[in-house]
Regions:
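Core catalytic region of metal-dependent phosphoesterases/phosphodiesterases
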Residues: 2, 6-86, 189, 228
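Active-site-proximal beta-strand elements of phosphoester/diester hydrolases
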Residues: 2-10, 88-97, 163-167, 224-229
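Catalytic metal-binding/acid-base residues of hydrolase active sites
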Residues: 10, 35-36, 55-57, 83, ...
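Catalytic-core regions built around general acid/base machinery
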Residues: 41-46, 193-201
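A short helix->loop->beta-strand "cap" motif at the edges of active sites that frequently abuts
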Residues: 45-48, 202-205, 223-224
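Binuclear metal-dependent phosphoesterase catalytic core
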Residues: 62-64, 84-87, 196-201, 213-250
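Active-site-proximal loop/helix segment associated with metal-binding centers of metalloenzymes
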Residues: 89-186
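Proline-aspartate-enriched helix->loop->beta-strand connector
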Residues: 161-170, 195, 199-209
Length: 250
C-alpha cells in the first residue's frame, strides 16, 4: 500500500488533483500544511487527505472545524498535539510556525487577526464597511498560525507513532538564500528547537515537514526527516509498510 504526501498547496488545487489522479492506486494522502488559497478556500479531494495547519490558512474555518463543524469532503484535520490513524499508520501532527513571543500562550488564547474578529462580528461576505485588509496581512496578524508549548508537550506524550507531520523543520536546517547583486548569499539555520525536542521524544519512523518550498533530506538521530517541496513541483509516495519513499516530480 502506498500513501501520498504533499506540502504547501497554497490553493493550487489543480496540482493536488493532478497528483491524486495520477495515482489511482494510492488511497490516502497526507499534507504538512498551507492548504488554503489566498481567499481561504479549501479543496474537496477525491481521496482522503489528512493534514495539519500551516501558517497560511483560513483560521476561522479551522476553529469552526475544531469546534465540531464538518470539514469539506475528504479533508481530515489532525489537530496539534494529536495523532490519527491513516490506514495502518499512526500519524502525529504539530502544525503552524514558531514565534518566541507567543510560545508560552495557551493555544485557546492565541488572538485572531483583526480582520478575522471583524468578520466574526459581521459574518462572511463583502459587506460595506468591512476592513480593507489583504489576505496576507490578515494571516500575519492572526496568531493562531503558531504552535505553542502546551501543544509541543502534548505531542511529546503521544507515545509510539509512525509518522510525525510538522510544518516547521527541526534544527539544524541550513538554508542559503539566493544571492543578490553586491551581497553575499545569506546562510541561516531555519530549524526550530521545539521540533527537534518532539522528534527526540517521539522517535517516529519518519518525519515530514514543509514551509520552506524546497526538497531536503536529512537524518536526525536515526530518523529520516524530509522537507517536502510545494505541490506544483513535487510530492512523495510512501510505502506504508517500510516507510521508504520516492520523490515524484510534477
Amino acid at each position: 500500500m502506498l500513501i501520498g504526501a504533499v506540502a504547501d498547496i497554497h490553493g493550487n488545487f489543480d496540482a493536488l488533483t493532478a497528483a491524486i489522479e495520477r495515482h489511482p492506486d494510492v488511497p490516502l494522502w497526507i499534507c504538512v500544511g498551507d492548504v488554503a488559497s489566498r481567499t481561504g478556500a479549501y479543496p474537496e479531494p477525491s481521496r482522503p487527505l489528512y493534514w495539519i495547519k500551516g501558517n497560511n490558512e483560513n483560521f476561522d474555518r479551522i476553529a469552526a472545524w475544531e469546534a465540531g463543524e464538518p470539514q469539506p469532503r475528504n479533508l481530515h484535520l489532525i489537530r496539534n498535539g494529536t495523532a490519527a490513524a491513516v490506514g495502518p499508520l499512526r500519524v502525529a501532527g504539530l502544525g503552524g510556525t514558531f514565534a518566541p513571543t507567543w510560545f508560552e500562550t495557551r493555544a485557546a488564547d492565541l488572538p485572531a487577526g483583526k480582520a478575522s474578529r471583524s468578520r466574526l462580528r459581521q459574518g462572511y461576505g463583502g459587506q460595506e464597511g468591512a476592513p480593507d485588509v489583504s489576505p496576507d496581512d490578515e494571516k500575519r496578524d492572526d496568531k493562531r498560525r503558531h504552535f505553542v508549548r502546551e501543544e509541543v508537550e502534548a505531542c511529546k506524550g503521544l507515545g509510539p507513532v509512525d509518522i510525525l507531520l510538522t510544518h516547521e523543520a527541526a534544527r539544524p536546517f541550513i538554508l542559503v538564500d539566493e544571492p543578490r547583486p553586491g551581497a553575499k548569499p545569506r546562510r541561516r539555520d531555519a530549524g526550530k528547537p521545539a521540533i527537534s525536542d518532539v522528534l527526540a521524544a517521539l522517535k517516529p519512523r519518519l518525519h515530514l515537514c514543509g514551509h520552506h518550498h524546497r526538497f531536503i533530506e536529512t537524518i536526525r538521530d536515526g530518523v529520516p526527516s524530509v522537507c517536502i517541496d510545494r505541490i506544483n513541483r513535487s510530492y512523495l509516495l510512501i510505502d506504508a509498510s517500510t516507510l521508504a519513499y520516492r520523490r515524484m516530480d510534477q
